[in-house]
Design a protein with these regions (language model features):
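Append "and occasionally in soluble cytosolic enzymes with long acidic Gly/Pro-rich linkers
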Residues: 1-80, 84, 145, 152, ...
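Periplasmic binding protein-like
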Residues: 58, 80-134, 168
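Short, solvent-exposed loop/beta-turn-alpha elements that line the ligand-binding surface or hinge
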Residues: 25-40, 50, 102-106, 127-158, ...
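Bilobed periplasmic-binding protein-like "clamshell/Venus-flytrap" ligand-binding domains
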Residues: 6, 48-66, 107, 111-115, ...
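Conserved C-terminal helix/tail region of periplasmic/extracytoplasmic solute-binding proteins
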Residues: 76, 80-84, 89-90, 157-158, ...
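Flexible loop/turn segments at secondary-structure boundaries
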Residues: 15, 27, 64-67, 98-100, ...
Length: 217
């Protein structure tokens, strides 16, 4: 992950261990990230009867996004790491609209995606990206539908008790870590250059641009 952050994000990102970024409420810092251990990976493949490795598709986005500035480069780095343990990845891409359509239809084996939050609420990540409902033509590209996870995120979105929501989302992050429906690689740091004569512009945490209080001097 550190190598990817350096090469793909030019250092403008942090290694991820949870779906939501560490700046969002409900973040569970007690979750331990997976260690980089190729020998253990080989042992697990052998245990699964795949000692000689296997081939798999790795879909890479054809566009540059705030959460992934160079998906092709990231895919190549993942491909190289997988090759070290005997997994041969074929990088696949399509035009962006076709990519999204095919991914929603579940045509991929593994697919690279990302997310920019819409409202600052953990539900916008957990339910939007990994709920059972979202696995059916939604944004749950992993197609993962897991009842113990669902039993945490659905009550969390239904209550207005903030402390209860925090507790439920922290538990949900543990479940995601243990089940691993996706490997969360990085949380990007987004920069917005502003000329010195522009006054009153504030960077929006949700990626929007507000100009009502902006002036030029």
């Amino acid at each position: 992950k550190d190598a990817i952050i350096k090469a793909v994000y030019q250092g403008a990102g942090v290694s991820a261990k949870n779906l939501i970024p560490p700046t969002m409420w409900g973040y569970n810092d007690d979750v331990q990230d997976y260690t980089y251990d190729p020998e253990k990976a080989k042992a697990l493949l052998k245990e699964a009867g795949l000692e000689k490795g296997f081939s798999i598709d790795l879909w890479a986005m054809p566009v540059q996004r705030p959460y992934n500035p160079n998906a092709r480069r990231m895919a190549e780095m993942i491909q190289a790491d997988w090759a070290k343990v005997g997994v041969q990845a074929k990088i696949v891409t399509y035009e962006w609209g076709e990519y999204l359509k095919r991914a929603k239809d579940g045509e991929h084996q593994t697919v690279m995606m990302g997310w920019t939050g819409d409202n600052g609420d953990p539900d916008n990540f957990f339910a939007t990206l990994f709920s059972c409902a979202a696995s059916e033509q939604g944004s749950n590209y992993s197609k993962w539908c897991y009842k113990p996870f669902e039993d945490l995120i659905q009550p969390a979105r239904a209550t207005d008790d903030h402390n209860k929501r925090v507790d439920l989302y922290k538990q949900a992050q543990v479940v995601m870590h243990d089940q691993a429906p996706a490997l969360i690689i990085a949380h990007s740091t987004v920069f917005e250059p502003v000329r010195k004569e522009v006054k009153g512009y504030v960077v929006d945490p949700l990626g929007k641009h507000h100009f009502e209080n902006v002036s030029i001097e």
